[in-house]
Amino acid sequence: MTITPQEALQRTIEHREIFHDEMLHLMRLIMRGDLSPVMAAAIITGLRVKKETIGEIAAAATVMREFANHVEVQDNSNFVDIVGTGGDGSHTFNISTASMFVTAAAGAKVAKHGNRGVSSKSGSADVLEALGVNIDLQSEQVAASIAETGMGFMFAPNHHPAMKNIAAVRRELGVRTIFNILGPLTNPAGAPNQLMGVFHPDLVGIQVRVMQRLGAQHVLVVYGKDGMDEVSLGAATLVGELRDGKVHEYEIHPEDFGLQMVSNRTLKVENADESRTMLLGALDNQPGVAREIVTLNAGTALYAANIAESIADGIQLAREAIASGKARAKVDELVRFTQQFKR
C-alpha cells in the first residue's frame, strides 16, 4: 500500500518508521520532482529528527541507484570504491583521492564517486581538476577509464541528474539530511567492495548494515575518533566490516600496523592547489604524515578490494606502490587518458 506524503510526515513526527515499500514510493516522488518543496523539506527534516533507520536508508539508496546513470563495468573482481560522506569539518587534503592512485597501482580497480567541495576546502572533483584530470566524462568513458587505467572518477552531478529536484530544498535547509549519507551508498558503477568514511560514530554500524542489505561483498566503514571520515593516524578508528554477509565491529590503532600516532593538524589545506601539492608529495614518497595516512588508507582499501589478506598486508603493498613510483605514475596515466575526451 502506498503512503501519502502527509501520512509519512505524521509518521516521522510520531517517531515511527516508514516501511521499505513506502520509502521507495516517497523517494521516487522526490527524485521525480513530484513532491512540493515544502513537503519534501518537511519529510527529510522529520526523518533527520526521528533518526533514519537502516531500512529507510537502504530503501532511499535503492531508489537513488534506480535513477542514476550507470557505469557498466565488465570485470567486478578486486573492484572497490574509496569514498567519504564528507562533512567531518577537518579540512584535510584529499586522502581518499590520493589513496585511489595507490590502490590502483597495487592492482585493484577503483571507481571513485565524488563531487566538488561543499563542507571541505577541496572536494575530490576539485583536486582531480587541479591535477589536470578531465572529470566531465560520459558513463562509457568512465568504464573505458576503469578498464584501461584501473581508475574511474564519476562526477556525481553527471550520474545523479534527478538530485536537481531536491537540490534547492537541501541548499535552503542548510542542515544535514538523509541525502548527506546516500552518496557513498550509490556508486554508479556498482563497486561491490568499499572503504567508506563517515562523519559520525553512529554511522559506522548503520552504513555497514545498509550496505549489507544492498548486497555488497566486502565493505569497511570507518570513523576516526578524532572526527575524521578516514582511517586516522591521530586517534583510534572505529571499523564496521561486512565480509561474507556478516558484520563485525572493532577498533584499530596506528600502532597496530607499526605506525606512529600523530596529529592530523598538519594535513589541513585551504584550497585545491594546496591539496594537490600535499597529494603529490605523498605519492612522490616524501616522508611525513601525508604519506603515512595515504599508506594507511590505501592499505585498508586494498584489504577491502580483496587484493590484500589483511590491512597490515595492504599497508605493505601500498608502501611498495608508492616507493616504486607506480602510484605517482597513475596520476599521469589518468590525466592522459581522460584528456582525450575533453569537449
Curated annotation (Swiss-Prot):
The protein's annotated pathway: Amino-acid biosynthesis; L-tryptophan biosynthesis; L-tryptophan from chorismate: step 2/5
Binding-site list for Mg(2+) 1: S96, E230
Requisite cofactors: Mg(2+)
Residues annotated as binding anthranilate 2: R170
Cofactor stoichiometry and binding remark: Binds 2 magnesium ions per monomer.
Record EC number: 2.4.2.18
Annotated residues for binding of 5-phospho-alpha-D-ribose 1-diphosphate: 84, 87-88, 92, 94-97, 112-120, 124
GO molecular function, one term: magnesium ion binding
Keywords: Amino-acid biosynthesis, Aromatic amino acid biosynthesis, Glycosyltransferase, Magnesium, Metal-binding, Transferase, Tryptophan biosynthesis
Positions that bind anthranilate 1: G84, N115
Assigned GO CC terms: cytosol
Residues annotated as binding Mg(2+) 2: D229, E230
Superkingdom of origin organism: Bacteria
SUPFAM superfamilies from the UniProt entry: Nucleoside phosphorylase/phosphoribosyltransferase catalytic domain, Nucleoside phosphorylase/phosphoribosyltransferase N-terminal domain
Family: Belongs to the anthranilate phosphoribosyltransferase family.
Role according to the record: Catalyzes the transfer of the phosphoribosyl group of 5-phosphorylribose-1-pyrophosphate (PRPP) to anthranilate to yield N-(5'-phosphoribosyl)-anthranilate (PRA).
Subunit structure, interactors included: Homodimer.
Protein known as: Anthranilate phosphoribosyltransferase
Higher taxonomy: Bacteria, Pseudomonadati, Pseudomonadota, Betaproteobacteria, Burkholderiales
